[in-house]
């Protein structure tokens, strides 16, 4: 997700927050999700190391890339909330 799209999502969230349609995101919520994402990334890396099929390895690498993207977004959000 590009920076522009991410900024739009933050603006949308802020508008929903002001209108009472969304609850405030707490750093503890983000930290909880971040822990889960890091565990998932570690598990995927371990599975990639043991898989011999090239197709499955490629699919797992795609999942790992998505997990890493989500981790970087969660870290950004945590910095913004601090």
Could you say what each language-model-derived stretch is?
Residues 1-36, 79-82:
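Long, non-catalytic architectural segments outside compact domain cores
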Residues 43-44, 67-82:
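Amphipathic alpha-helical coiled-coil segments
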Residues 5, 33, 41, 61, ...:
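Residue-level signal for functionally critical sites in structured catalytic/ligand-binding pockets
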Residues 21-24, 51, 68:
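Residues at alpha-helix boundaries and short interhelical turns
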Residues 31-35, 56-66:
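Short, charged, amphipathic alpha-helical segments
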Residues 8-11, 35-46, 69:
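Generic structural signal for well-ordered, non-membrane alpha-helices
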């Amino acid at each position: 997700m590009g920076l522009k799209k991410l900024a739009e999502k933050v603006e949308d969230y802020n508008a929903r927050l002001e209108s009472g349609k969304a609850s405030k995101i707490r750093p503890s919520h983000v930290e909880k999700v971040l822990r889960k994402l890091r565990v998932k990334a570690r598990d995927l890396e371990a599975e990639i190391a043991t898989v011999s099929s090239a197709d499955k390895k490629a699919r797992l690498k795609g999942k790992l890339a998505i997990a890493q993207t989500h981790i970087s977004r969660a870290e950004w959000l945590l910095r913004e909330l601090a």
